[in-house]
Amino acid sequence: MPPAYQSAFHKIISRDKGVFEGHNFLVSVDTINWIHVNTLTITEQGQLFSSDSKDNHYLLLQSLQSCFIQIYPDSNISGSGKSSISQPPPTTSTRRNLLRKSSNLNSSDQSHSKSSEDNEHQPPAILIKTFDNDKLYIRIPSKANFGNLLSCLMVWQNLKPQGLAKKWYCENKVIEGFNPNAPIYELLVCRFKIYGPLPNKYKNLNIVPGPKAPVYQQKMDDFKANFDNSYIITPQISSDNHNSINEGWFYAMGALNSHGILNFISELDGTLLYSIDIKQILSSEIREMHNSIFNSSNILFIGQLKELRYNNVIRTLSTLTPDQLLTPFLTRDGKIIPNNQRILIEFPLHIDLEDWFVGLNYFAKREYIGSFDNESKLIHNVEHPQLYDFSKANFRVSKKMSIDIIEAKFENTETNKSGKIYAEVRMWGFPWSRTAIVNHTNNPFWKEEFSTDLPISTQMVHILIKKCSFNDSSYSTGDKLIGTVYVTPDILTKQIKTTSTIMTSSESSQAIQMNTVPLSSMASNSNAGLDIVRLTINDPNNIPIGKLLLEVHLQEYHILSPSVFKPLEKMLVNAPMKDLIKFCNENVPSSDFERVSLVLLDIFQSLEVEDDWFKSLMEVELVNVDIMTRKNYHQRNSQDQAVSNSKTQQQSSHNNVFNTLFRGSSIFSKSLEKYNLRIGQEYLEKVFGDFFAKISNEKKNCEVDPRYVRIQERALRKGKSIHEATGLENGQNEDVSDDDDDDDDNSSDDDADYNAEKERERNERIKQMVEENFQNLYGYVEEIWYKIYITSNDLPDQIKLQLKNFRTKVELVCDPEDKVTSLNCLSAFIFLRFFCPAILNPKLFYLAKNHQTGSTQRTLTLIAKILLNFANRQEFSPHKEPHLVRMNVFLRKHTPEIYDYFDKLTGRKNDFNEKILDLSHEVKRFDLGLDKTSNELPTTPYLIDKYLRLTEIVHLLDYSKYVKNIGNNNNGSMSNLGTPVNSPSRDMEREQDRSRSRSQSGTPDLDPILNLSDLKLNYENKYQIGSLEFEKSEFLELTGDNETEGFIKSLCKGNEEIFSFINSNITLKDIQKQSTKIMNKIQELEIYLENYEFPNNYKDQIIWDSFTDDIMNKCWLDTSRNCLIYSDHVPSSNNQYKKLVDHAFSGLKLKFNDHQKLNGNSTMNSLINNGGMGNRNGHDVNGHNNNNNNNNNNTGDGYNETDRNQRLSSTFSTISIGSAIKPNTSKNPFKKWLRKN
């Protein structure tokens, strides 16, 4: 029995799979010159060909993927592509003239009645506009060809064009097994402060003061530019001045339930304020707010970013405005609450933010690059599968961007500049970061870095230079805009060498359609490898007013599904960490130590083996120390005293080496430094936050250097403030101080006695100032050391554990009598790399709102210097810093305490200090109970994206990029290829090369891959997405499979020791092989997704039928332009859009050559409702029996070319649309519209 189809469109799409062939058409590229073609053909590759009577073929359109389709019911076609419906109806005489011009009838002396009759029988036309902006008009005289061609074009509209970014899609992973009838329970509950609409009756709300949150400010320039160039959309502009939503900060209870609904509940009476359906939010719309916006690092943004959503849309397939893409955001009892499409949540602790960030992203729509392939299968067994029930070949995209705003230089020096300015990073109409507020000079300086994750579709970033309008010490939504800087795709992709989702200007034809903005003019840079660029600042009138110096860095990685990384995870847990460290030391430039160290730290911390990682790092770092210690011990116990005496100077140099241990940059020092700052960030905030605010507010003078105090005293005599005097001490206005000295000298010649007395008074006053400043400084140092000392028990246990292990390791390799080196090493990490950087630059660690300048910065510098000397147990010398010698009193007084402090941190003494900070790391973390789909989400704590980091290590360990070099020199060391010239291991490698050339034998201990053949990879062209030959599990990979694990254990007869040996006997080469394998899969998938989509990607008929249903369910007719669009949802209140399956064509008065109108329910409605009737009744166009052909149709997509034409016309036959057409093959149906020539 033949399958039942909902409509003729369903049947044609399901059967023909985008292939078309029809006869007798008129085509044109400008609606003026029309050409008759005998045959039109659409191939399986999406190419549109025409053929003439001599069987000559011509390519009309190269690719139909994501093409724009517009229908012209009559002949009123203009070159601009506007539909006749969007224009006033022309008069009879006007229509007659247009038809005469476009048709050029063979007989120019036809009567008026004949011409009028011809005009009424003009067939409809279809405009095809490809994604690459090629246009073609086609006039179609036959109903059968019209229906079949339109069905075919609908298939190609839903196939994506070339480019990775075009394969963007989003999906809810949780909905796949979602049961709406399942009991609702709460996953997360928290009391927090939110910024959102205040309910009308908010007496029961705990409203608190706070900074006003910015609302959406439109910056889009081309919402009006539609793909068909026919309509001008003027969106409503939302600004602060017209914001009528009453918003504010208030406390509320938040509850995220198991159905993905976030409820906000009044904490006083328990009433529901409003709710958000997180399942309607994109994952890129849940974002952490930068500390600079609200002076808090615990604020989360949740909203609908209309510009971001608009950029995700392929414009050829949609005419929806940005506002129409939004869904109801805040609701209460099914009613929409007026809102600004975003709320802000401030959590009490950062660990709360981390838990909620993961929980919200669990329900949100996750974004991928992907497409269906021949291995797409049903994820769940359902009776009537939808397209989203099938798997895709996909990967996640991570685009981490960092912008370091250094300084600006304004060109117009004549303008009187005063007040304060700052820079603001803006995306999608919202600010996401701000610099500190500085003086408005010709050359303002910031040097502040902002890092964030860019969504897939984001191609550009704006940086606004603003001037404070109301308060020079705070930001305001009404601050004046001075200029704008555009960070364009060309700048973002300077260092990306692989396939990227960001399209540069040279690839604009393939880029996502986005806002057109002026390109910034870059200054010539001789070193293209540098990230530092100088971009033009344009004022609101788009006139250049200066340059902004900034450093832009973007890293893009394509991340496969977590299952691909399981074997690699198993290997890294049991990895030979020392070999890995040696590999990094030999192949990673010192400039990349910090980045690679953080990657490795994140990996091993997420795998919960960071303790083993740090132990290996320590042992590798201390090897040279151990060797040096042994040499010193041998020299000290040598029988030859003469030799011993001659080595005295060398031993002294060795002692200097011990004193400077771990003061430089290495993978270990960078890893432990990052680890301590990550774990101890909250500790620093609670210990130092109030202290820095106190120093900034009190503004006490702590300068104890008499030279600077003399300058301050002189400035005070001139009536200047201490702040201005501090400007003098920092090197400003040096000429003024010199003039003062000259004045003093000149006056001293006139009256020596009087000036001598005055000078004595001045010296006495300076002495008093120094004493007063010393007491201020001493008090601050006492206070900060007291805060550090009494909170030794509050320092996170993770930090203390690493310091304990570190001290033990150092003592083992040092001389037994050496009690100094280990303490100096502790000081290098706990003070030099932890406390002192936070003191010197509080804003960098979010401990202060603005940069510390003037006397405050000088005070902090002195405090850090004193603490560092104190930690090193080193007194100040009268020869170097005589003004700080008096602080030796503090050092001697508290020396026992510093020893006691180090012993407590490293577990040598019991710490009986009471815990007073109540840090969040003491709070027990609970399991959210999420399913396996949460594996790809960041891990808690610290929101580590484990699979991003594994992808980065795969790129680091992959050797396939060196294939050419290996082919040229098979005997060369692989490590040499990646080792920088300034690497500390280069000398050792050169020595190894010389030894290798002499002996022609011997390999490094690491046994690096000398030839790619060592990897034993099969490079035959058998890589196919899904069936991937290289995915076949090798022995080591089998440990990642539970069933295979059991099988191996059974082979080992249950011997756990043998199985553990298999699992732990991993070499670096094994990890490199696995990395190369994953890298190959990423590259293969990139190539596949970079290409166009084709119908043959849907191999299975079941998935093709689901694809057909998906096309018809999303297809709408925009009646204002008569074009087809595709969307999951269209505003129900808008009558502009009609669903195709709901008789959308009934309003089009389509006229064909048989004088029958496709109008009303009797014609086109029968096309929708009675699809395939002709075949089911067993008749062809002429009414003849066609049962054999019908039986062939039931076989699915298999049919031969000989009956293609007959079958193409059978579904849209005259019987299926309820009318009869008399065939007329003897005459050309377009004869009366063709020109004479």
Swiss-Prot record:
Site for Arginine finger, residues: R663
Domain of life, per lineage: Eukaryota
Biased composition (Basic and acidic residues): 111-121, 986-996
Occurrences of domain Ras-GAP (ranges): 637-905
Gene Ontology biological process terms, A to Z: actin cortical patch localization; actin filament organization; cell adhesion; cellular bud site selection; cellular response to electrical stimulus; hyphal growth; maintenance of cell polarity; small GTPase-mediated signal transduction
Domain C2: 381-503
Record-linked PROSITE patterns: C2, RAS_GTPASE_ACTIV_1, RAS_GTPASE_ACTIV_2
Sequence ranges of Low complexity compositional bias: 79-110, 1183-1199
Residue stretches in coiled coil: 1065-1093
One function term, GO molecular function aspect: GTPase activator activity
Compartment(s) where it occurs, according to its Swiss-Prot or TrEMBL record: Cytoplasm, Cell cortex; Cell tip; Cell septum
Lyase among keywords: no
Record Gene3D superfamilies: C2 domain, GTPase Activation - p120gap, domain 1
InterPro entries: C2_dom, C2_domain_sf, Ras_GTPase, RasGAP_CS, RasGAP_dom, Rho_GTPase_activation_prot
Residues covered by region (Disordered): 79-124, 721-762, 969-1007, 1170-1204
Keywords: Cell adhesion, Coiled coil, Cytoplasm, GTPase activation, Virulence
Induction remark: Expression is increased in low iron conditions.
GO cellular component, one term: fungal-type cell wall
Compositionally biased region (Acidic residues): 735-754
A Pfam family hit: RasGAP
Entry function: GTPase activating protein (GAP) for RSR1 which is involved in the polarization of yeast and hyphal cells. Directs the site of new daughter cell growth in yeast and hyphal cells. Important for hyphae to maintain linear growth and necessary for hyphal responses to directional cues in the environment (tropisms). Required for correct localization of the septin rings and stabilization of the polarisome at hyphal tips. Involved in cell adhesion.
Protein name: GTPase activating protein BUD2
Organism: Candida albicans (strain SC5314 / ATCC MYA-2876)
